[in-house]
Every structure is written in C-alpha cells, then in structure tokens.
C-alpha cells in the first residue's frame, strides 16, 4: 500500500483513493504532502457515483466484472491490475486492454516472467502519468468514452432497451 501511496504522490495528479484496509496507515507526512491533489477515503463508497463524475479521468482497478462495466459505461479508461490469476480478473484485464483498447496494463510479471507480488511506486507513477496525459492515455480515453456512449445509447428509448421493454410487455401480457 505504501508503494501505491508513493506512486500516486510521484505522479502529481489529482486522485481519489478508496482504501478498504483497516490496518494500513499512510507513511509519515504523506497525507500532508498530497492534501492538495489527493483525497483518501477509508470507508465504503458508491463506486458508480464516483465513476460517473465528469472529473474522473481514470480508474485503477482489479478488473472485477462490475468494476469494468461501471467504468466503461461511464467512459472512464482503466489502469488494469488484476489481483487474482485464477479469477475472471486477468481475462477482464486482457479484454479491456487488448480487446477493447480502453485501458493500460499495470505489469503483472517481471522481465523473467515471474509474478510481481509487490508493485513498485515508479510503475504506478509511470502508468498513471501515461493514462492521464500520455499519447496512449489519450487513445484509451477516447475509446473508453466511445464505449460509454455506445452503452448509454443501448439503453436509450429506441435502443436495445426498447426491444427489452417489448419482450417484458409480451411476457407480462402472456402470463395474465
């Protein structure tokens, strides 16, 4: 957690960090140093509301399905960092980055192919800066925004939502 904290500080970009750990405490002086650019929340938050806010420019995610869907539906690109190789997280991360082009990978393996168990602050800083201002970041942001527009269009009147409403109407009338 300290490495994430230092990486966020080094990136020198505004952030909201939701910390669910009951035992982690920020490094000495860190909170004071980032108070102008960072907000740390030590409690549950409604992720959808945060991702829907227009000032959110990216989302560092473990790539659980709900997190991916909420982020992309709101047009927010992802820094993908799956925690578990044996879950859907790794597959979702590949879908977001390689399939959809709406995210940037936080490396999971070192040069020798070994699983990275502790992330380095420099990696967090570098990937955050790339997402928020680099050429690749601009590209994945455009793609995420396009996917967000498509998602909202699908549920607008006349989109896929209309067909779903018609199906529900038919099923409801048939059962009455």
State each model region's role.
Residues 1-176:
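Catalytic core of nucleotide-sugar-dependent glycosyltransferases
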